A protein has these predicted regions:
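Glycine-rich phosphate/diphosphate-binding loop of Rossmann-like nucleotide-binding domains
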Residues: 36-86
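N-terminal glycine-rich FAD/FM-binding segment characteristic of electron-transfer flavoproteins
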Residues: 2-43, 58-62, 85-104, 179, ...
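Short, ordered loop/turn segments at secondary-structure junctions
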Residues: 54-55, 86, 114-115, 149-153
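Proline-centered loop/turn at the N-terminus of a beta-strand
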Residues: 47, 108, 142-146
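Glycine-rich phosphate-binding loop
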Residues: 91, 95-133
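C-terminal binding/interaction regions
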Residues: 3-7, 11, 15-24, 123-197
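Electropositive phosphate-/nucleotide-binding environments in soluble metabolic enzymes
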Residues: 57, 61, 65, 86-90, ...
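Short, well-ordered amphipathic alpha-helices
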Residues: 68-71, 100, 174-177
Length: 197
């Protein structure tokens, strides 16, 4: 059997006519019958929950600090931020559940942790299971979690990433929290608080 060798010209010829280039669309306004929801990072009316691991605390503290500063820069008030800490990344999914049960008015959550590869399989276990737990929580509860669980090979990689990762997570939480608010208002407009059922 011959080895596969990619042929760019043949590939391009095979695709010719199969795809239509879509012109850029302004995603901030109604375009014909398509309604686009404008992304928003305005945090002035949002309530955000944060779960931060204490293991590798130097990294988690740095991510928390940059997340907090970004939330504040976008208008989130201190009284609208709820924070708890847990021993490590594996405890984050359970804490997300408890935090959301205790504060059902949260608009979005942030999960902060740092998993650094060691010499055993434990790295894969913690990295995979904490991520799976966060994803399971999101799909079960219907609230967004900005996943800021950093998984890296070594401390040097973590040091390079911690500052921006926390700020990125804050922006994700803000945008998704606003989307949740917008969609919640649409549900109320369409069905009202009491639709008679």
């Amino acid at each position: 059997m011959a080895a596969f060798e990619p042929n760019a010209e043949r590939f391009a010829e095979d695709l010719k006519g199969r795809f239509v280039r879509i012109p850029p669309i302004n995603l901030t306004e109604k375009n014909g019958s398509i309604e686009f929801i404008k992304p928003s990072a305005d945090g002035s009316d949002l309530k955000i929950g944060i779960v931060s691991a204490r293991f590798n605390d130097w990294a988690c503290d740095a991510m928390f600090a940059s997340c907090y500063e970004e939330l504040k820069a976008h208008g989130v008030k201190d009284e609208n931020i709820v924070v708890t800490t847990v021993p490590g990344a594996l405890e984050i999914p359970g804490a997300l559940v408890m935090l959301y049960e205790g504060y059902p008015d949260l608009d979005a959550l942030v999960a902060i942790g740092c998993v650094i590869r060691g010499e055993t399989y434990h790295f894969e276990l913690v990295a995979n299971e904490s991520s799976r737990g966060v994803t399971d929580f999101v799909t079960t509860e219907g609230i967004s979690v900005a996943n800021c669980i950093l998984t890296v090979e070594n401390e040097e990689q973590a040091k390079v990433r911690v500052q921006e990762k926390g700020a990125d997570a804050a922006r994700v939480a803000l945008e998704m929290g606003n989307l949740r608010r917008f969609c919640g208002r649409r549900v109320m407009e369409n069905y009202g608080e009491d639709n008679g059922q």
